[in-house]
Amino acid sequence: MQCLAAALKDETNMSGGGEQADILPANYVVKDRWKVLKKIGGGGFGEIYEAMDLLTRENVALKVESAQQPKQVLKMEVAVLKKLQGKDHVCRFIGCGRNEKFNYVVMQLQGRNLADLRRSQPRGTFTLSTTLRLGKQILESIEAIHSVGFLHRDIKPSNFAMGRLPSTYRKCYMLDFGLARQYTNTTGDVRPPRNVAGFRGTVRYASVNAHKNREMGRHDDLWSLFYMLVEFAVGQLPWRKIKDKEQVGMIKEKYEHRMLLKHMPSEFHLFLDHIASLDYFTKPDYQLIMSVFENSMKERGIAENEAFDWEKAGTDALLSTSTSTPPQQNTRQTAAMFGVVNVTPVPGDLLRENTEDVLQGEHLSDQENAPPILPGRPPEGLGPGPHLVPHPGGPEAEVWEETDVNRNKLRINIGKTPCVEEEQSRGVGVPSSPVRAPPDSPTTPVRSLCYRRVNSPESERLSTAADGRVELQERRSRMDLPGSPSRQACSSQPAQMLSVDTGHADRQASGRMDVSASVEQEALSNAFRSVPLAEEEDFDSKEWVIIDKETELKDFPPGAEPSTSGTTDEEPEELRPLPEEGEERRRLGTEPTVRPRGRGMHTLTEEDPRQMLPQPAPPQLSQADGRSETSQPPTPGSPSHSPLHSGPRPRRRESDPTGPQRQVFSVAPPFEVNGLPRAVPLALPYQDFKRDLSDYRERARLLNRVRRVGFSHMLLTAPQVPLAPFQPQANGKEGEEEEEEEEEEEEEEEEEEEEEEEEEEEEEEEEEAGALGEVLGPRSGSSSEGSERSTERSQEGAPSTLLADDQKEARGRASMADGDLEPEEGSKTLVLVSPGDMKKSPVTAELAPDPDLGTLAALTPQHERPQPTGSQLDVSEPGTLSSILKSEPKPSGPGAGGGVGLVAPGAGVTAVTSPFTKVERTFVHIAEKSHLNVMSSGGQASRPEELSTGGELGLEVLSEGGIAEEGAPAPLENGMALAGLDGTEMESCALSGPPGETPSEVVTDSLPNGPALADGPAPASQQEPVTKKGTTISPSRHAMPGSRPRSRIPVLLSEEDTGSEPSGSLSAKERWSKRARPQQDLARLVMEKRQGRLLLRLASGASSSSSEEQRRASETLSGTGSEEDTPASEPTTALPRKAVRAATTRSRIPRPISVSMPVEGQQLPGRPHGAASATDLAITSRLQLQKPSGLAPAADLRPKQSASRGPGPGRAQVSKPAAPRSPGLPASTARHPSGSPRSQSLSRKESSSPSHQARPGVPPSRGVLQVRSQPEASPVAPKKGPKGKQLQTQRAATKGRAVVSEGRPGAR
């Protein structure tokens, strides 16, 4: 947390500024000898200045660290630098000293660092000639430091710089010894290794041992050299975009390193084999490795005196100061060293660990190094400064300075991140660094952050969102925190992440909504980067900033974007077009922030890690609020957030408000955050779809393709459940992340946060796509990946359970009850998109085949999909989903009939593919644009929603089969409108909690104002349903209306609300019950899932529209939006698959709504399900009228539904299931394990109607029909109250699938 403070101090810090203000002002004279000229770097530990040595009149590097910082790294730097004097490749030490205010080291000034030089190359790579010759020099420097008994432990490109003088410009110097450690004892023997050592170094280049927190040895420095050289030659590493230490460690451990050699000289196999054979005690054969370089050069005829690549370019790279070097300080220790905010390095005080053992005699005392003071020159500036005696140590000043610079840059953020990173490395819940909210988001400067453990990246996202509420700087720093969603997505312990829960106030800030949305994006793209405050990231900010501008900035004010100028030491690993990155980021960022951090974290750093971390627990995180965040049994290790969160903001689901998403829904106390998280999930699918459409956007064409295609494919196929559960948190930042990655890697300690970003970047990275393609595939976008993950989950279970399976298993059980599904959970949340719904109608078919859509809905549980900025989110995702859904409507008939039809990988894929290709792509583009627009306006918040809502919207629009009808127009004329539609649907699903509450809410929502209202409250209600806080949702919704203008289509809020409120009451219980019951329900859930998957999907479509507008439509039982969806979901739920198919076949045909009105009325009382998110108010009012009649028209509704959707009986049956759901929400509540999910499911079912409702003409009637159908069940619902509860409990257990299945059981 203190780490965060560092970033908070000054956003400029990110750019390399000081932790706070620069420690030294310009023209300040240190020790009467060194006059500060300018700051050239800054890190977590301190700052690096270019200074003029008044004695020698030469420019030197001055590294300064505050004397107040807990981590004092300069001591180690001085100790090692002094020991290395006289060695080649080591800066000349000039002096050191300290005073009351700061410690400093003066050394020779060097030129540009290698990370900067590589990034400056056209392709981001060095030729083999340059790579091999640099390799030789770096190897010599490594051998030199080892020869004096020290390990560098942070070997990376930014810690090596070329000389800047004519005599040294071709020599490579080793910098930054702050992380060094003495591996020998006083007798020169190798010290015994510690059992557990804190992680040191930079994630990207760290050895597997370092990732495992094992004692690092000499071979670990060589592993880092190996990774460096591969990166030099290839331009990137497979894990380049992944910032999460745990994930990268898992990838490295499993990765076939020989794959890295395909572009390297054949001799490198000897290098790899040798270092792989070494252990801690074994001395490396430096000569063997040197011979590898030399032989490779001979083979290629490379001369030692050839020009280096940057020399050929005619650049004066070498002559520029080592400012770029600062990124080196991104290493973890540097962060710790910076000591900003009492950050302690990862397990074990790095500084202490390094210096206490070895440097007992080392002091920065002026006397020790006192150089001749210029006579007559009184010490200027430093009050105590006078006694800073420059140490005319001599030749090493440069190294010190450079390291200092790097560290300083890094340390700025590092201060805050190190502790978090440490926690993360320890596997302890790491406070998710909140996404730094865009400046526009009004956040209290520094809200007391409640760090709660977040099980999933999404939860982190929520936390990020919450953080976003905190000041931008804070947000940034938090984002930087390893706990940040992106981090979480990457981290192997997503569930354990701590989510920062800034107070309710943060969440409530209405302005936050847009800010949150943007923040989320920023968090997604920047959050991981916020660590960028660290040197590397800071410098890299130029690159990732560009991306940020595209994705994040457009979403939120320029100020929001952290100007992390960590030295772009290594972050801009890939020189990919920034715009693509930006767009990708947009897509990804918008998705999770987790995606910043997360929505499903989305931010998943790597597919691999995700698979590794398929722990459902993370998904549950999102419900930190009082939902059963911990509901997810899979994340028992991490503290259940539910309790924690419930206190601070019971309604806010950690998952829902992942990071920025929560922020987005600031207005809705908890839901705003939810909205953000939702946005994350939505973005994910959207990104994937979009990626399908535009591979160019994906940095890693392969990976992206895998993700995009994989996403839909996964959604359809759902082969990897575990992956899906993995956190999608880091997804958002892939594009940016490349650069960021490099920087972040350099800021290891703080970088862990960045690691997530890097992970995200990696996801986009082609390398990742190739090497980690499968693993990363699901994580193509941070959000996307998360969604995919969820989708995968749902895909895996697709045939049987869209998301239910994975959700159920991974976190479905616990999470289902929790509405707080994270983006990852989103897939689990797919439950919200009732499979039954998907099955029911064409929409159902669409949904089923569109696991993505389902995933979106699932990913962003309705609560998660709070549609505060639903329309924004929806816009982006909805198009994608809706197009998919639209395309899929036909399959839905069969799918619904089959129950798995849509879900079936083959069928689903086919359906999805077609939609993706045409409607989906079209919609995706439209949605993307609107999504981006929305995102820019309130996009971040909507992004999470987008994920979930997008899916729903897709359902909504697609189910109608006329995306253009409602969905396309909405995105076109009003990105928000489309999003709103989608969002509303989703929200209505999520929001339809308590029947009583819903009606009023629905009424409000139904009003012209309704869409916005629905949107606003939707997040809350969505969250509520999950949390079983229907009541809360209602208020939230009302509060949110202003912030949630995006959905114009009235949503069936009542549906969701009804489920939600009862859910709300039982949220905790259900959560826990769910956890207890997850396995029990698994079998049933599987069956129900299969049957209900379509329902769920349909429901998700409807749900999305319901969510936002459900409240208003709830009353009105929007016949419009949910007509198709509702009928589809209703029939699916109630009817056998055949019936569903029949219903689906007819579901597209609009039916008269007049008869339904009475039913709606009844329905509202019985169970307001926000039947539809009617595109127009007219429909809404119509629905409202119907709603009052609710139950009475139940029969009518059934026949209509039968006619439109399929057999009357099927409709009636569906209605029944739907009705049971509404009561079921409460029932669901009773059934703790599945209450939330069931709520979601219920809402989703009802959402189905909203989905259709979104469809203009047909949907209304259908929605009405469905709604009526539900009202029919409404009486039953009341009757089913108990039974419904049971069913709902089951559904909750099935996580929405259960809902669908329950509906089916009811029907059956």
UniProtKB/Swiss-Prot annotation:
Binding site for ATP: 40-48, 63
Reaction catalysed by this enzyme: L-seryl-[protein] + ATP = O-phospho-L-seryl-[protein] + ADP + H(+); L-threonyl-[protein] + ATP = O-phospho-L-threonyl-[protein] + ADP + H(+)
Protein's name according to its UniProt entry: Tau-tubulin kinase 1
Phosphoserine: residues carrying this PTM: 441, 541
GO biological process assignments: learning or memory; negative regulation of gene expression; peptidyl-serine phosphorylation; peptidyl-threonine phosphorylation; peptidyl-tyrosine phosphorylation; positive regulation of gene expression; positive regulation of microglial cell activation; positive regulation of protein polymerization
Domain of life the protein comes from: Eukaryota
Ranges for domain Protein kinase: 34-297
Biased composition (Basic and acidic residues): 541-555, 574-589, 786-795
One GO location term (cellular component): perinuclear region of cytoplasm
Molecular-function GO terms, alphabetical: ATP binding; protein serine kinase activity; protein serine/threonine kinase activity; protein tyrosine kinase activity; tau protein binding
EC number: 2.7.11.1
Expression sites by tissue: Expressed in the brain. Strong expression in the cortical layers, the CA1 layers of the hippocampus and the granular layer of the cerebellum. Also expressed in the large cortical pyramidal cells in the temporal cortex, the CA1 pyramidal neurons and the cerebellum granular neurons.
Xref: PROSITE patterns: PROTEIN_KINASE_ATP (PS00107), PROTEIN_KINASE_DOM (PS50011)
EC class: transferase
Bias (Polar residues) ranges: 485-496, 868-885, 1020-1035
